[in-house]
Amino acid sequence: MGIPVEGTKGEAEAGQEELNIKYADVLSTADHHTLAKHGVKEIAHQQGYAATFLPKWNKNRVGSASHVHQSLFKKGSNVFYDAKAPMGKSKIMDHYLAGLLKY
């Protein structure tokens, strides 16, 4: 399938697994995540199991989350970082976060 998996690890609940897919351009990343989810469901089905990506399938069990790490580079440099700024956070990062919150 060509999905660049960086690693996996067990999580808090029995049968709960974390899958880390290597970063790529936006469209490739979306494709990798979609293919991975379909692949996991198909493999589970072939083994007589069901895989779910629900965030909370049982109120008495630990939930799951889906999150995406984001970065922004220009000419090989991380534009979110500014060594002189408080906490190393650049103005570009401030604007980027404001856009995420607004839209």
Label every model-predicted segment.
Residues 1-103:
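Glycine-rich, acidic/polar active-site loops that bind/position phosphate-bearing ligands
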